[in-house]
Amino acid sequence: MNTRITFRNMDKSDVMETYARQQLEKIYEFLKNERTPIHIDLIFEPSKLREHHRVELRIKTPNYDLISNYEYPGTGFYDVLDRVIDVMYKQLRDEKKKRVDSRKHLARADDFKKNR
């Protein structure tokens, strides 16, 4: 898995990067059986005009492209990152369920054709 953590318009923080990698472990566990290549981009970006912190997470695999971003005033990057990870995990779970359901549907259709 190729993981890139970017800090836009701010200094790099080793503590924040370590926390982000710990939070991404949930995503890594979910993607461990997926086909490669898998690209993960995590972007931290503060707002210059307001006290908003924006975090964006992009995951690109051979099966799907997913983007999750969150921006909220008055909260720290850690809270925003937790929210983005949770939303992305739900998106991945839903996409995987769709793929499994479609395979089951195709298998049932094949069985139906054989029995006719």
Question: How should these model regions be labeled?
Answer:
Residues 1-116:
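N-terminal, polar/charged subdomain of small-to-medium soluble alpha/beta proteins
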